[in-house]
Every structure is written in C-alpha cells, then in structure tokens.
Amino acid sequence: MLYWLAEWLGFPGALNLIRYLSFRSGAAVATAMILGLWIGPRFILMLRMRQGKGQPIRDDGPQSHLAKKGTPTMGGLMILISLMISALLWMDLSNRFVWACLFVTAGFAVVGFLDDYDKVTKSSHRGIPGRVRLLVEFLIAGVAVLLIVSRTGTDLYLPFFSGIVIPLGPFYYVFAMVLIVGFGNAVNLTDGLDGLATFPVIIASLTFLVIVYLSGNVKFAGYLGIPHVPGAGELAVFAAAIIGACLAFLWFNAPPAAVFMGDTGSLALGGALATIAVTAQHELVLVLVGGLFVVEALSVIIQVFWYKRTGKRVFRMAPIHHHFEQLGWPESTVVIRFWIVSIVLALAGLATLKLR
C-alpha cells in the first residue's frame, strides 16, 4: 500500500527510499516484529481465556510434556496478523507473485485454524479429517501454481549444476502442488517442541530472502547462473515480514512456551516458504534448506509404513524429535541441536548459488 502511495506521489524526497527492496525488506522486518511484540501479550491472554484447557497433550508422549497442559494454541494467528499487515504495507501489490504467496499463506492458515479449533473444542488430537484437509490444501496450492507458472514456466533447475534443466511440462504443476502441500505439512509435523519450528523457519526465510532477491535481479542471476525471474525480488519483502513476525513469536514461544503456534501458523509458514521457492524456481534448494522439516516428515511416513507392514517401529516415537527425547535428550538439547542443523543446511543451500 505504501509503495502504491509513494508511486502515485512520484516518490518525492524521502519516499524515494520505498523504491528499494532493501529498504522495504528492513522495514517489513521491523514492522512485523514490533506488531508481533505489541499484540503478543494481549493475544495470549485472550487465547487463555477462550481455550481453557489449551492444546491437548498426547498421553503417549514424553512425560515432560504433561507440564505443558493448559498452554494455549492458535498462536499462529499472532504471526499471521503481523505478517499480513507488514506485507500489505510494504509490498508492491501489483505483483502477481505477491498475491500467490498471500493466497497460500491465508488459505493454509484458515485450514490450520479450523483444525486447531476442532482439536481444542473436542479436546482431541484428530482435528478435521485428513483427506478433507489435504484436498483443500491442494486446491489452494493449485490456484497459486497457476498464477506463478504463467510467468515462470515448467522447467526444473538442478542445484549445483549450471544450465542443466529438466523440462517437466504439465507434470510440473503436480510437482509444485505436492511441494507446497508437503512442505506445509512438514513444518506442521516439526512444530512439536518449544521453538523447534520457529527458528528454522526464520533461517529458511532469510536464505530465500537472499535467493529471491538475486533471482529477481537480471545481473546477479546472470552472474551466478541461476534462473532469472522478473518480479521475484518483491518476495524478499515477504520473506522479511515472515522473519519479523517469527522473531516476535519466538519471544513468547521460547521455553517454557507461553503459546503454541498450532496448525494455524505452521501450515501457513510452510506453505509460504514453498510458494516462494516455486516462484524463484529453486524448488530442490528448498528441500536442502528445509531438510530438517523434510526429515521430520519422512520419519513419520517411514514409521507409519513400517508399522503397518511389520507391526514394528523404526523409531521409538515419531516425528523424529520425539525419538531423541525418548533416547533421553532434554527438550532444550533437541531444539538447539536441530537449530544448528537448520543453519548448516541453510549455508549449504546458499552455497548452491555459487558452486555450479
């Protein structure tokens, strides 16, 4: 909105700064973080009053988690409010990539909210039926992919190699939809310990802030040998807003958490990151940068598949962060070590920009 206003006025004086992605990205971080810190205490109090028992805690999980009973969920709404306000203020709203990201973020947030609401009101872990949830997520992802691909094409670029492209054609639509839905649910599965998902989301967002900025600049993209996507740089502002909103949320989600993100936040953030990656045509780099989330999701898939096939478990408990808890690792140890892994994977993802 501010970009439109400044453009309408002709970018006079200090408003000329709004032309620059770097300025608007910094402003988006600050705006989202300040908003999040301001609404946080009020929002948490409201959630406590409305939810009563808070998020249901699994009885078959680590015994230390029983102390978390009564902690409110749906804290992702705090993230969404500060993220959306900041993004709408500082982004160029004439950019279709912006609307694709906003659509996935809001759509997945609604799905997550309904799931959280069902769990809280029924004091159950089930939520809305999985098939219904996946169907809606795929429909949302499909709309976003149509918006994006009309400007980017259907080629898949391989990281670490310059000029090697796999033309997927119509199959790209399915691939991109699976990536968006899968990554959204992978972040959701990771959000099981205080701060575990939030910090890696910040790291992944920072990484893709750099990637989309470079992809959107024809000179940088040409120098690095990465696909140039005109207009993709605008999503650097969106990634910055995610960072600011998540930093504010982490203030309240740090152990012992005063609020949980819930499916409302985790689904939305995962979907948003994947949509940014699809726009920048760095889909496989997302799998590397978000490797922590991928491993968490794979641990659940492997556990369920193997148990149904043999009646035995591969892990003591899935997702895999609970496996390490069952091995005797304190929650804080699991969280910090997983944070370290996310940083290393992000650095590896950035290395793909140069190592070609």
UniProtKB/Swiss-Prot annotation:
Pathway: Cell wall biogenesis; peptidoglycan biosynthesis. CDD domains: GT_MraY. One of its GO terms (biological process) is regulation of cell shape. GO terms for molecular function: metal ion binding; phospho-N-acetylmuramoyl-pentapeptide-transferase activity; UDP-N-acetylmuramoyl-L-alanyl-D-glutamyl-meso-2,6-diaminopimelyl-D-alanyl-D-alanine:undecaprenyl-phosphate transferase activity. The chain crosses the membrane at residues 27-47, 73-93, 97-117, 134-154, 163-183, 195-215, 232-252, 258-278, 285-305, 333-353. It catalyses: UDP-N-acetyl-alpha-D-muramoyl-L-alanyl-gamma-D-glutamyl-meso-2,6-diaminopimeloyl-D-alanyl-D-alanine + di-trans,octa-cis-undecaprenyl phosphate = di-trans,octa-cis-undecaprenyl diphospho-N-acetyl-alpha-D-muramoyl-L-alanyl-D-glutamyl-meso-2,6-diaminopimeloyl-D-alanyl-D-alanine + UMP. InterPro entries: Glycosyl_transferase_4 (IPR000715), PNAcMuramoyl-5peptid_Trfase (IPR003524), PNAcMuramoyl-5peptid_Trfase_CS (IPR018480). It holds the Pfam family Glycos_transf_4. It is found in: Cell inner membrane. GO terms for cellular component: plasma membrane. Keywords: Cell cycle, Cell division, Cell inner membrane, Cell membrane, Cell shape, Cell wall biogenesis/degradation, Magnesium, Membrane, Metal-binding, Peptidoglycan synthesis, Transferase, Transmembrane, Transmembrane helix. It is a multi-pass membrane protein. Its main location: membrane. It comes from the Bacteria. Its EC number is 2.7.8.13. Catalyzes the initial step of the lipid cycle reactions in the biosynthesis of the cell wall peptidoglycan: transfers peptidoglycan precursor phospho-MurNAc-pentapeptide from UDP-MurNAc-pentapeptide onto the lipid carrier undecaprenyl phosphate, yielding undecaprenyl-pyrophosphoryl-MurNAc-pentapeptide, known as lipid I. Belongs to the glycosyltransferase 4 family. MraY subfamily. This is Phospho-N-acetylmuramoyl-pentapeptide-transferase.
